[in-house]
Amino acid sequence: MLIFLLKELFRHYIANGSSMYVTMLDASKAFDKVNHSKLFTKLIDRGCPSFIVRILYYWYRTQKFTVRWCCSFSEFFTVSNGVKQGGILSPHLFNVYMDDLSVNLNKLQIGCLYAGTIMNHMMYADDLCVFSPSVAGLRKLTDCCAKYGNMFDITYNAKKSVCMVIDNKPRDKKNIHPVVINNHTLPYTEKCKYLGHIINNNLTDDDDIARQKRCIYAQANALARKFYLCNNSIKTTLFNSYCGSMYTSSLWCHFKKQSLKGITVAYNNSFRIIHNLSPRCSASHMFATNYVKSFNERIRSSIFSLLCRLEKSDYILFVKYLHTFIYYQSPLIKHWIDQLYAFNS
């Protein structure tokens, strides 16, 4: 859903002849650097009941750790930073710790006007993306992130953080003003990965389709090696779980026919690899026999699922988006309608 909103925002600005300057910031081990004292102070300032704060304080202050090396263990030690990896409360505590950064970015009133709301960043856990129609605005947003990181022990890795210009026109990177964070100049790239989805500077989806194709082949070969003795029912279940759930496939709308044909072949071949079938066997027959969805059915199912989630969402930005002309002019929405209501394949 977050990637959908981000790409729709970029498409809207490109369609209106404007560029978009984006920075993907990589926070190095952000969950491990949460300062406990500052976290508890934020909880108190937000009005969290004092007994809950005391429970969390006691829980984090009294926990002890040890390091295992082969059959030996180190002495127990305590830590003063970080939230527990995999803990139920950890994502919520981290959101509280980082929420003031979102507030500070919104106070700048710099960014993009979209569905009646000024937007300049999107954050999911420690994955942060800031954007602005101008380089000057992007530099102010990046400086705000750097200042907050220095105040609350969040270090942004300049080597893994990148900038990108979303535009239909080719641009010379040398003529674009640099973006600096922690005295390091961030490089400009033509594509980057955000939340596992590859975003290209011209918003084409060929690179992300290629990524998914590699994942399908890798999963199929791994399953074929490990579960070659299982029966067909188990193999089909594994195929549906690992090869059938194609991440962000519902967001593909600008791609070459060759790219789509390549991933269709990969999808069909992965089923043959897992079931040890002949490369020449009919794809439609093997899917019908094993009650498995074809590639086009998978795409339509993922589109319908995302569309239902979008219409049922109570998030204010999605509600505004559904009631604006942007929704009806979106190329992605038109592609969805063609896929759901035109049964040519």
State each model region's role:
Residues 1-45, 136, 159, 249, ...:
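Charged boundary/loop elements
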Residues 29-46, 121-150, 168, 201-204:
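Catalytic palm subdomain of template-directed nucleic-acid polymerases
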Residues 125-126, 157-162, 166-168, 191-311:
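Non-catalytic, peripheral interaction segments enriched in hydrophobic/basic residues
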Residues 6, 26, 43, 56, ...:
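Mobile genetic element proteins and their domesticated derivatives, centered on retroelements
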Residues 12-16, 28-32, 45, 82-91, ...:
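Conserved, non-catalytic sequence blocks in retroelement Pol enzymes and Pol-derived host proteins
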Residues 71, 155-190:
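Short, conserved micro-motifs composed of acidic
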Residues 93-125, 129-131:
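Active-site palm subdomain of RNA-directed nucleic acid polymerases
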